[in-house]
Amino acid sequence: VTFKVTGGEQGEWAVLQVSGELDLVTSPVLRQRVHDVVAEGHHCLVLDLSEVFFCDSSGVGVLIAARRLIRSCQGRLRLVLPARGAADGSHVNRVLGALGVRRLFDVYGDVNAALGDEGEPLSA
């Protein structure tokens, strides 16, 4: 299984699409990409995690660190997770919910919703 992070820009937002397993081995890759994006001057970041099918505590740690970094720049971080809810939604959503940190993040059902200003985040 290949872990991949691809990036692009849409207006003021940097978008990182993540796929594969987000774990102890792969989480440093995502951490570095987030740091690179912020170092390039992007303070609005969408992390598309809809293709991440496994996430362990180190992956959650990277998400929390990304939130802290973006907030320190007065930026905005939005996560994209499939909109099926915490109960039967993505593995990442279930892990965030189980660890009690889901409420820390603005979560959207797809990238277009995350990029829009009128869409409300999905409820935790």
Label every PLM stretch briefly.
Residues S58-G59:
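Helical "lid/switch" subdomain of P-loop NTPase nucleotide-binding domains
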